[in-house]
Amino acid sequence: MERSNRKTRIGRVVSNKMDKTIVVAVETKVRHPLYGKIMNRTTKFKAHDENNTANINDKVLIMETRPLSKQKRWRLVEVVEKAK
């Protein structure tokens, strides 16, 4: 099964208090439509972490997947960088 067409995002883990679930904050830069200022937009995604490997402030790669619950549509692919 080809998975290259699924969306991926890189973000920081902001919560890991739930069992097998992490909250990942993904920051994107967006230009204001009228004034042109570049702003940071933050979107939070709930992602499935099967082995509870990610900790707070880890940089992680998540991938879109089938709906796993009411709010979870992403899963953890790898921990890119551990928190210091």
From Swiss-Prot:
Recorded GO terms, molecular function? rRNA binding; structural constituent of ribosome
Identify the NCBIfam families for this entry.
PRK05610.1, uS17_bact
> What is the residue range of the signal peptide feature?
none
Q: Which CDD domains match?
A: Ribosomal_uS17
- Please report which protein family the annotation says this sequence is part of: Belongs to the universal ribosomal protein uS17 family.
Q: Which Pfam families match?
A: Ribosomal_S17 (PF00366)
**Originating species:** Clostridium botulinum (strain 657 / Type Ba4)
Reply yes or no: does the keyword Ribosomal protein apply.
yes
Name used for this protein in its record: Small ribosomal subunit protein uS17
What's in the keyword line of the UniProt record? Ribonucleoprotein, Ribosomal protein, RNA-binding, rRNA-binding
Q: What does this protein do?
A: One of the primary rRNA binding proteins, it binds specifically to the 5'-end of 16S ribosomal RNA.
Record keyword Cell cycle present: no
**Record's GO cellular component terms:** cytosolic small ribosomal subunit
Q: How does it assemble?
A: Part of the 30S ribosomal subunit.
Task: From the record, give the transmembrane residue ranges.
Answer: none
An example GO BP is: translation
Enumerate the PANTHER family for this protein. 40S RIBOSOMAL PROTEIN S11 FAMILY MEMBER, SMALL RIBOSOMAL SUBUNIT PROTEIN US17M
